[in-house]
UniProtKB/Swiss-Prot annotation:
It comes from Desulfovibrio desulfuricans (strain ATCC 27774 / DSM 6949 / MB). GO terms for biological process: amino acid metabolic process; pyridoxal phosphate biosynthetic process; pyridoxine biosynthetic process. Its EC number is 4.3.3.6. It is an enzyme of class 4 (lyase). In the presence of PdxT, forms a dodecamer of heterodimers. The active site is at residue 80. The gene is pdxS. Keywords: Lyase, Pyridoxal phosphate, Schiff base. InterPro entries: Aldolase_TIM, PdxS/SNZ, PdxS/SNZ_N, RibuloseP-bd_barrel. This is Pyridoxal 5'-phosphate synthase subunit PdxS. GO terms for molecular function: pyridoxal 5'-phosphate synthase (glutamine hydrolysing) activity. Gene3D superfamilies: Aldolase class I (3.20.20.70). It comes from the Bacteria.
Amino acid sequence: MEQGTIRLKTGLAEMLKGGVIMDVTTPEQAKIAEEAGACAVMALERVPADIRAAGGVARMADPTIVKKIMEVATIPVMAKARIGHFVEARILESMGVDYIDESEVLTPADDKYHIDKRDFTVPFVCGCRNLGEALRRIAEGAAMIRTKGEPGTGNVVEAVRHCRQVMDEVRMLCALPEAEVPNFAKEMGAPLELCLLVRKEGRLPVVNFAAGGIATPADAAMMMHLGCDGVFVGSGIFKSGDPAKRARAIVQAVTNYKDFALLAEISRDLGEPMVGIEISTIPSGERMQERGW
Protein backbone atom coordinates (compact mmCIF):
# COMPACT_ATOMS: atom_id res chain seq x y z
CA MET A 1 0.00 0.00 0.00
CA GLU A 2 1.99 3.00 -1.25
CA GLN A 3 -0.36 5.82 -0.35
CA GLY A 4 -2.53 5.74 2.71
CA THR A 5 -5.32 7.85 1.26
CA ILE A 6 -8.51 7.99 3.30
CA ARG A 7 -10.40 6.44 0.36
CA LEU A 8 -8.02 3.48 0.31
CA LYS A 9 -8.04 3.10 4.08
CA THR A 10 -11.83 3.21 4.39
CA GLY A 11 -12.00 0.74 1.51
CA LEU A 12 -9.83 -1.71 3.46
CA ALA A 13 -12.15 -1.34 6.46
CA GLU A 14 -15.20 -1.93 4.22
CA MET A 15 -13.78 -5.39 3.45
CA LEU A 16 -14.43 -6.39 7.08
CA LYS A 17 -18.17 -5.61 6.97
CA GLY A 18 -20.38 -8.42 8.21
CA GLY A 19 -17.52 -10.02 10.09
CA VAL A 20 -16.23 -10.71 13.60
CA ILE A 21 -12.88 -9.43 14.89
CA MET A 22 -11.52 -11.41 17.83
CA ASP A 23 -8.96 -10.53 20.52
CA VAL A 24 -6.13 -13.08 20.69
CA THR A 25 -3.01 -13.27 22.86
CA THR A 26 -1.21 -16.28 21.35
CA PRO A 27 -0.65 -17.82 17.90
CA GLU A 28 -2.80 -20.78 19.02
CA GLN A 29 -5.73 -18.48 19.78
CA ALA A 30 -5.22 -16.76 16.42
CA LYS A 31 -5.62 -20.11 14.65
CA ILE A 32 -8.79 -20.89 16.64
CA ALA A 33 -10.22 -17.50 15.66
CA GLU A 34 -9.30 -17.98 12.01
CA GLU A 35 -10.75 -21.49 11.87
CA ALA A 36 -13.95 -20.18 13.48
CA GLY A 37 -14.37 -17.71 10.62
CA ALA A 38 -13.10 -14.44 12.13
CA CYS A 39 -12.49 -11.72 9.52
CA ALA A 40 -9.51 -10.37 11.51
CA VAL A 41 -7.75 -10.78 14.86
CA MET A 42 -6.60 -8.20 17.40
CA ALA A 43 -3.15 -9.10 18.76
CA LEU A 44 -2.82 -8.35 22.49
CA GLU A 45 -0.68 -9.24 25.49
CA ARG A 46 -3.80 -9.45 27.69
CA VAL A 47 -7.51 -9.39 26.91
CA PRO A 48 -9.49 -6.47 28.39
CA ALA A 49 -10.82 -8.52 31.33
CA ASP A 50 -7.24 -9.25 32.44
CA ILE A 51 -6.17 -5.63 31.89
CA ARG A 52 -9.10 -4.49 34.04
CA ALA A 53 -8.28 -7.02 36.79
CA ALA A 54 -4.56 -6.22 36.85
CA GLY A 55 -4.93 -2.43 36.97
CA GLY A 56 -1.84 -0.26 36.57
CA VAL A 57 -0.70 1.11 33.22
CA ALA A 58 -1.62 -0.89 30.11
CA ARG A 59 0.63 -0.29 27.10
CA MET A 60 1.10 -1.52 23.55
CA ALA A 61 1.76 -5.27 23.36
CA ASP A 62 5.33 -6.56 23.12
CA PRO A 63 6.20 -6.56 19.39
CA THR A 64 7.32 -10.19 19.72
CA ILE A 65 3.75 -11.25 20.58
CA VAL A 66 2.30 -9.23 17.70
CA LYS A 67 4.89 -10.63 15.27
CA LYS A 68 4.26 -14.25 16.29
CA ILE A 69 0.53 -13.80 15.70
CA MET A 70 1.20 -12.13 12.33
CA GLU A 71 3.36 -15.08 11.31
CA VAL A 72 0.57 -17.65 11.75
CA ALA A 73 -2.51 -15.63 10.73
CA THR A 74 -3.64 -15.51 7.11
CA ILE A 75 -6.40 -13.00 7.96
CA PRO A 76 -5.74 -9.31 8.79
CA VAL A 77 -4.03 -8.60 12.11
CA MET A 78 -4.86 -5.52 14.19
CA ALA A 79 -2.98 -4.22 17.22
CA LYS A 80 -3.71 -1.57 19.85
CA ALA A 81 -1.86 1.66 20.57
CA ARG A 82 -2.53 3.98 23.49
CA ILE A 83 -4.67 7.06 22.86
CA GLY A 84 -2.34 9.83 21.69
CA HIS A 85 0.77 7.61 21.56
CA PHE A 86 1.87 8.21 17.98
CA VAL A 87 5.22 6.45 18.51
CA GLU A 88 3.52 3.18 19.51
CA ALA A 89 1.42 3.59 16.36
CA ARG A 90 4.51 4.18 14.21
CA ILE A 91 6.14 1.06 15.67
CA LEU A 92 3.08 -1.03 14.82
CA GLU A 93 2.92 0.48 11.33
CA SER A 94 6.60 -0.34 10.75
CA MET A 95 5.89 -3.96 11.73
CA GLY A 96 3.27 -4.25 9.01
CA VAL A 97 0.08 -4.70 11.03
CA ASP A 98 -3.04 -4.34 8.89
CA TYR A 99 -4.95 -1.98 11.21
CA ILE A 100 -4.23 -0.04 14.40
CA ASP A 101 -6.81 0.43 17.16
CA GLU A 102 -6.25 3.67 19.08
CA SER A 103 -7.81 2.11 22.12
CA GLU A 104 -9.31 3.20 25.41
CA VAL A 105 -8.58 -0.34 26.71
CA LEU A 106 -4.98 0.81 27.11
CA THR A 107 -3.99 3.66 29.43
CA PRO A 108 -4.09 6.96 27.49
CA ALA A 109 -0.67 8.48 26.80
CA ASP A 110 -1.96 11.98 26.00
CA ASP A 111 -4.80 13.63 27.89
CA LYS A 112 -5.25 16.36 25.30
CA TYR A 113 -4.76 14.96 21.79
CA HIS A 114 -5.60 11.77 19.94
CA ILE A 115 -3.18 10.55 17.26
CA ASP A 116 -3.27 12.47 13.97
CA LYS A 117 -4.10 9.43 11.87
CA ARG A 118 -4.11 11.22 8.51
CA ASP A 119 -0.34 11.00 8.16
CA PHE A 120 -0.24 7.20 8.50
CA THR A 121 -0.40 4.62 5.72
CA VAL A 122 -2.08 2.01 7.94
CA PRO A 123 -5.83 2.43 8.62
CA PHE A 124 -7.00 3.16 12.18
CA VAL A 125 -10.08 2.09 14.12
CA CYS A 126 -11.30 4.23 17.04
CA GLY A 127 -14.06 3.96 19.64
CA CYS A 128 -16.95 6.34 20.25
CA ARG A 129 -19.91 6.85 22.57
CA ASN A 130 -21.78 9.36 20.42
CA LEU A 131 -21.81 11.03 17.02
CA GLY A 132 -19.55 13.89 18.11
CA GLU A 133 -16.78 11.50 19.22
CA ALA A 134 -17.18 9.45 16.02
CA LEU A 135 -16.88 12.48 13.74
CA ARG A 136 -13.90 13.91 15.64
CA ARG A 137 -12.04 10.62 15.19
CA ILE A 138 -12.98 10.48 11.50
CA ALA A 139 -11.73 14.06 11.07
CA GLU A 140 -8.40 12.91 12.57
CA GLY A 141 -8.22 10.16 9.92
CA ALA A 142 -9.96 7.12 11.44
CA ALA A 143 -11.06 4.70 8.70
CA MET A 144 -13.31 2.66 10.97
CA ILE A 145 -15.42 3.39 14.06
CA ARG A 146 -16.64 1.08 16.82
CA THR A 147 -18.70 1.56 19.94
CA LYS A 148 -16.62 1.83 23.11
CA GLY A 149 -19.01 -0.20 25.25
CA GLU A 150 -17.38 -1.19 28.53
CA PRO A 151 -14.54 -3.61 27.66
CA GLY A 152 -13.75 -6.65 29.75
CA THR A 153 -17.16 -6.81 31.46
CA GLY A 154 -19.10 -9.33 29.37
CA ASN A 155 -21.96 -6.83 29.72
CA VAL A 156 -23.38 -5.55 26.42
CA VAL A 157 -25.49 -2.71 27.86
CA GLU A 158 -22.94 0.06 27.22
CA ALA A 159 -22.31 -1.06 23.63
CA VAL A 160 -26.07 -0.92 23.08
CA ARG A 161 -26.24 2.53 24.66
CA HIS A 162 -23.43 3.90 22.48
CA CYS A 163 -24.80 2.35 19.30
CA ARG A 164 -28.27 3.76 19.93
CA GLN A 165 -26.81 7.17 20.79
CA VAL A 166 -24.94 7.38 17.48
CA MET A 167 -27.97 6.18 15.50
CA ASP A 168 -30.31 8.60 17.30
CA GLU A 169 -28.01 11.55 16.63
CA VAL A 170 -27.65 10.58 12.96
CA ARG A 171 -31.44 10.54 12.63
CA MET A 172 -31.67 13.89 14.43
CA LEU A 173 -29.09 15.39 12.04
CA CYS A 174 -30.87 14.03 8.97
CA ALA A 175 -34.13 15.65 10.10
CA LEU A 176 -32.60 19.11 10.53
CA PRO A 177 -33.02 21.90 7.97
CA GLU A 178 -29.66 22.57 6.32
CA ALA A 179 -29.50 26.04 7.86
CA GLU A 180 -29.41 24.49 11.35
CA VAL A 181 -26.57 22.05 10.62
CA PRO A 182 -23.74 24.52 11.46
CA ASN A 183 -25.11 25.02 14.97
CA PHE A 184 -25.55 21.23 15.37
CA ALA A 185 -21.91 20.74 14.31
CA LYS A 186 -20.77 23.36 16.82
CA GLU A 187 -22.72 21.72 19.66
CA MET A 188 -21.31 18.30 18.70
CA GLY A 189 -17.76 19.61 18.43
CA ALA A 190 -17.62 18.02 14.98
CA PRO A 191 -16.51 19.38 11.57
CA LEU A 192 -19.34 20.93 9.55
CA GLU A 193 -18.38 19.12 6.32
CA LEU A 194 -18.65 15.73 8.05
CA CYS A 195 -22.04 16.64 9.54
CA LEU A 196 -23.26 17.61 6.07
CA LEU A 197 -21.96 14.31 4.68
CA VAL A 198 -23.73 12.29 7.39
CA ARG A 199 -26.93 14.24 6.73
CA LYS A 200 -26.66 13.45 3.01
CA GLU A 201 -25.78 9.74 3.40
CA GLY A 202 -27.94 8.98 6.44
CA ARG A 203 -25.09 7.16 8.19
CA LEU A 204 -21.46 7.48 9.25
CA PRO A 205 -19.06 7.83 6.31
CA VAL A 206 -17.00 4.86 7.56
CA VAL A 207 -17.68 1.30 8.74
CA ASN A 208 -19.22 1.16 12.22
CA PHE A 209 -18.65 -1.98 14.36
CA ALA A 210 -19.92 -2.95 17.80
CA ALA A 211 -17.45 -3.54 20.64
CA GLY A 212 -17.25 -3.65 24.42
CA GLY A 213 -18.99 -6.34 26.45
CA ILE A 214 -20.19 -8.71 23.71
CA ALA A 215 -20.13 -12.24 25.15
CA THR A 216 -22.81 -14.38 23.46
CA PRO A 217 -24.16 -15.08 19.96
CA ALA A 218 -27.35 -13.28 21.00
CA ASP A 219 -25.34 -10.18 21.99
CA ALA A 220 -23.61 -10.16 18.59
CA ALA A 221 -26.88 -10.64 16.70
CA MET A 222 -28.55 -7.83 18.63
CA MET A 223 -25.79 -5.39 17.69
CA MET A 224 -26.30 -6.29 14.03
CA HIS A 225 -30.04 -5.66 14.40
CA LEU A 226 -29.22 -2.22 15.84
CA GLY A 227 -27.42 -1.33 12.62
CA CYS A 228 -23.76 -2.20 13.24
CA ASP A 229 -21.63 -3.41 10.33
CA GLY A 230 -19.87 -6.13 12.35
CA VAL A 231 -18.63 -7.02 15.81
CA PHE A 232 -15.45 -7.01 17.91
CA VAL A 233 -15.30 -9.68 20.63
CA GLY A 234 -12.63 -9.21 23.27
CA SER A 235 -12.69 -11.24 26.47
CA GLY A 236 -15.98 -12.99 25.64
CA ILE A 237 -14.43 -15.85 23.67
CA PHE A 238 -11.20 -16.89 25.36
CA LYS A 239 -12.54 -16.24 28.87
CA SER A 240 -15.38 -18.71 28.24
CA GLY A 241 -15.62 -22.47 28.77
CA ASP A 242 -15.37 -23.57 25.11
CA PRO A 243 -13.65 -20.81 23.11
CA ALA A 244 -13.61 -22.59 19.73
CA LYS A 245 -17.32 -23.42 19.84
CA ARG A 246 -18.31 -19.96 21.10
CA ALA A 247 -16.16 -18.29 18.43
CA ARG A 248 -17.87 -20.28 15.66
CA ALA A 249 -21.30 -19.52 17.13
CA ILE A 250 -20.66 -15.76 17.28
CA VAL A 251 -19.47 -15.72 13.65
CA GLN A 252 -22.62 -17.60 12.61
CA ALA A 253 -24.77 -15.23 14.68
CA VAL A 254 -23.38 -12.15 12.92
CA THR A 255 -23.90 -13.71 9.48
CA ASN A 256 -27.39 -15.06 10.27
CA TYR A 257 -28.63 -12.49 12.78
CA LYS A 258 -32.17 -12.53 11.37
CA ASP A 259 -32.57 -16.33 11.67
CA PHE A 260 -33.80 -16.76 15.25
CA ALA A 261 -34.22 -20.54 14.99
CA LEU A 262 -30.59 -20.87 13.96
CA LEU A 263 -29.55 -18.50 16.76
CA ALA A 264 -31.32 -20.79 19.23
CA GLU A 265 -29.50 -23.81 17.82
CA ILE A 266 -26.01 -22.29 17.84
CA SER A 267 -26.49 -20.92 21.37
CA ARG A 268 -26.81 -24.45 22.83
CA ASP A 269 -24.09 -26.05 24.95
CA LEU A 270 -21.44 -23.38 24.50
CA GLY A 271 -19.91 -23.98 27.91
CA GLU A 272 -19.68 -21.40 30.66
CA PRO A 273 -19.73 -17.79 29.44
CA MET A 274 -17.19 -15.37 30.87
CA VAL A 275 -18.05 -14.01 34.30
CA GLY A 276 -19.79 -10.67 33.77
CA ILE A 277 -19.56 -7.38 35.66
CA GLU A 278 -22.53 -5.12 36.42
CA ILE A 279 -21.62 -1.64 35.13
CA SER A 280 -22.99 0.18 38.19
CA THR A 281 -20.38 -1.58 40.36
CA ILE A 282 -17.50 0.02 38.41
CA PRO A 283 -16.50 3.41 39.88
CA SER A 284 -16.84 6.25 37.39
CA GLY A 285 -13.11 6.93 37.15
CA GLU A 286 -12.36 3.27 36.35
CA ARG A 287 -14.64 3.00 33.32
CA MET A 288 -12.58 2.55 30.17
CA GLN A 289 -15.28 4.15 28.01
CA GLU A 290 -14.57 7.51 29.68
CA ARG A 291 -11.08 7.62 28.19
CA GLY A 292 -10.80 9.80 25.08
CA TRP A 293 -12.58 13.03 24.22
